[in-house]
């Protein structure tokens, strides 16, 4: 699953969250957060945990699948 990194970083900035703090809030490792920010995919479970930590619906932070659109 691909996270919309631009939106994720905006939400982090708005909430004053560092990668470390987002990792703590979401229960996801800092390394995983860093990989996502650098464009890697993640599992739906990880995306969901990040969405919850950012107080967003999952659909708000996940990139839409343009191949099926």
Name each region found by the language model:
Residues 39-52:
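Short, basic-rich loop-to-helix N-cap that marks the start of a DNA-contacting helix
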Residues 55-69:
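Short C-terminal boundary/hinge segments that cap the last helix of small helical domains
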Residues 13, 34-35, 60:
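Alpha-helical and His/Cys-centered functional microenvironments
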Residues 1-18:
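A short, Lys/Arg-rich alpha-helix, primarily the initiator
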